[in-house]
Every structure is written in C-alpha cells, then in structure tokens.
Amino acid sequence: MHYEILAGKATIARVETFLHDIDEIAGSSNATIQAIDATKVADRQHIDEAVHQALGSFTDGHNIATNLGVEILLHLSACRQIKKALNFGVHKGDIDVLFVVVGTTKSIERSLQRLNQLIDADPRVIDYSEAKRGQLMQTFNITDKEVKAAGGYHRIPELVRERLALFDAFK
C-alpha cells in the first residue's frame, strides 16, 4: 500500500456533507481517505510515523480499529480511545486540513484530483509553527517542564513523536 498527503485550507459549512463527499471520493477511487485537523499534527514526520504504524498494525493484525482511517487517527493521537482520536478529525468552519490517502498509485491519483477541489492546497499547514504550540501541548499533555528539559518549544514535534512511539510499543 502507498499513501499520499494533501494539505490545505477549507471552509466546512456542514461536517456531515464534507465527510460524505470524502466517502464518495474514497468509494469511487477505491482508496482509504482520512481527513484530519492539521492544527493537531506536529509536522510531516508526525503524520508519516502515524500512517506507518497504522499500516503496520493492520499488517500484523494488531489493529485496534476495523477501519484504516480510524486506526490512523488512533496512532496520530497516540490514544487507544476511538472517541478521543476522532477529535483529530475535521470540524465546522475555516480549517487547516490534511487528507491521508491510502491505496494504489492509480487510486491515490484519482482521489487527489477530486480532493483538490475541496480545499485550497497549502502544504505549509503540515509544518510546526508557534500557532500550533498550545494545541499540541494540550492535546499530548506536554508540560513546560518537559519542554524545558527537551531544549525548548521548537522540540515539541519530537515530544509528540515520542508519544507515538510509546503508544505503538505499549498498545
């Protein structure tokens, strides 16, 4: 299985309609598509590690969820509780969004063409920024003391990825 990430900005009037459109694209393209709130993603490495872990869980038969998209959210959030992991999904309003598209090369290409119509592409929404700092610290229970010991706020993405590694090791 291959995957690609599409990132950008969207205005979501109705979450149900947005998710229905994504499900329709996934079904017609024969791909798995997971929409993610980009403000809860530390950086590209965070998303890559979560996707690799989720794919590995399915390969090894150690997956928690029966749906690959939900398994990606579980690993992304470093949390075993599906309800909490779903908080990494999209919400109503103006949002920075990521799509993880998993499938064959052809199914990914078809999906990306259609998903591009739903957003204004902007790959920078994946990158760590000071604007994400508070959200990430709260979401992953990272303390100021921990940040100081790690060497500063610019190390938050590393602390987030550490949470992912621990989640994968002890799930």
Q: What positions do the PLM features span?
A:
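N-terminal interaction modules that seed assembly of large macromolecular complexes
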Residues: L6, T11-N67
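Ordered, amphipathic secondary-structure segments that act as subunit-interaction surfaces
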Residues: D48-T104
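Low-complexity, flexible helical/coil segments
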Residues: V41-I47, L68-L73, K132-F140
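Helical mechanochemical/support elements of P-loop NTPase systems and associated helical scaffolds
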Residues: R14, F18, A78-Q81, S107, ...
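Glycine-rich, aromatic-bearing surface loops/beta-hairpins
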Residues: G89-K171
